[in-house]
Amino acid sequence: MEQVKYVKYAKEIEKIRDDFNEIVGGISNKKCNALLNEYMNDIVENSGKDSFEIAFIGQYSAGKSTMITALTENMDIKIGQNVTTDKVTEYKWKNVVLIDTPGIGTDQKEHTDLAFRHMDLADLLVYVVTTQGFDDLIARDFKRIAFEHNKSPKMMIVVNKTSLESMDNKVNWENDIKKVISPSTLEDFRVTFIDAKSYLDSLKQYNDRLKNALMVRSNLSGFIAHLNHFVEEKGIIGRLVSDLNIIGTYLDRILNEISTDEDRKKFKSFW
């Protein structure tokens, strides 16, 4: 039944792509034509993937790279308190590819543009925030990604760095998240609490009691369980949504370049 749904939705999305290509192809505008070429490259890249991709996104210093290090146990990944990721890097983990993206919400536009492009291309997104929660800037960026750009169907939220505060504050963290994601629920985004650094610290520990305590505090096993279930439940949806995300992104960019009312009318009738 799931496969039948996939075929049905895939055909509908293919028709949307064809309609989009036809409309853009009829516009005499060099910048629009250049954007159409970029768009086609992204569509080809997305359709030609042979691995399932999960992108880790969020503010800088939220611990995205640390989380990927904990999952892969690849100690060559650069981690730290400051901006350490300035490019997109892929890491193999089990049967999927984990994508480490630059932090958003900085004054480095090229970092944000790079992260947003891979949000479109990735099959699923893990949005990482810390126990400090959503300030106005982080909340604005999250809502833009999840709701304005329609990426919520392929997103989950992970709260990292739980060791910085008492777990007694978990209810407060959850209430903070609820305000931002409303009317969606914590369950919709599979909100998970972890401390990736504690897991890495456990790997250096020879005392079994301390090692186990750090592993429990990290909750990495809980995160992996949620992530696996997330892939099983949302994987097909995420792959379909990626094409729509790409179309939506280029639709906005091309609309900004269109100069005639007639061409704008064509696009509005499409969307």
Annotated model-derived regions:
Residues 1-101:
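Conserved G1/Walker A P-loop phosphate-binding module
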Residues 86-90, 110-117:
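Conserved alpha-helical scaffold flanking the Walker A/P-loop in AAA+ ATPase domains
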Residues 163-235:
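Canonical P-loop GTPase G-domain recognition
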Residues 56, 127, 157-159, 193, ...:
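Structural beta-sheet core signal
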Residues 75-78, 101-107, 132-135:
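Short, flexible loop segments at the rims of nucleotide/cofactor-binding pockets, characterized by
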Residues 12, 16-19, 23-26, 74, ...:
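Conserved, well-folded catalytic cores of nucleic-acid-processing
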Residues 207-218, 231-270:
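C-terminal helical "lid" subdomain and adjoining coupling/linker elements of P-loop NTPases
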Residues 95, 113-189:
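Conserved C-terminal guanine-recognition region of P-loop GTPase G domains, centered on the G4
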